[in-house]
Amino acid sequence: METVLEIKGLCKSYGDFELRNLNLSLEKGTLTGFIGPNGAGKTTTIKSILNMIALDAGTIRILGMDSVSGDLEIKSKLGIVLDDGHFYEDLTLKKMKNLIAPMYPVWNEGAYQSYMEKFSLPEEKKIKDLSRGMRMKYALVLALSHEAELFILDEPTSGLDPL
């Protein structure tokens, strides 16, 4: 099997919090979730994987590349949904998509339009006018529209209505 994510000896500390010597290996085709109480290190681990915070120690390899030296190439192959969004509030959904889509080597406009319709997301609405659930749906639409090789989702159902 092909390893898509490998973490060795990850250490990160903030004040009273310490993530110590985390080791993890994920094979292609597996579905894995982090479950634990608030403050257990789930989001810290995800932010470490995404090279959003500096590690105190350890290494992370994603899709065979070092997470630091291969950062841009790796991110072009990831479908990412973060709990805190990271969108430009004053842009419409369409303008945000037009800003994001060119960053990916592959963008599937048909998939994007299909997901926008399925999730009832109006392209002309500004991001600041979306509910938390609608923002999550939009983040999922973007993550699913560029044929990602690996998905990293931080609380992707937060704010979503139950089915």
Residue ranges and their predicted role:
Residues 2-7, 12-163:
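ABC transporter nucleotide-binding domains
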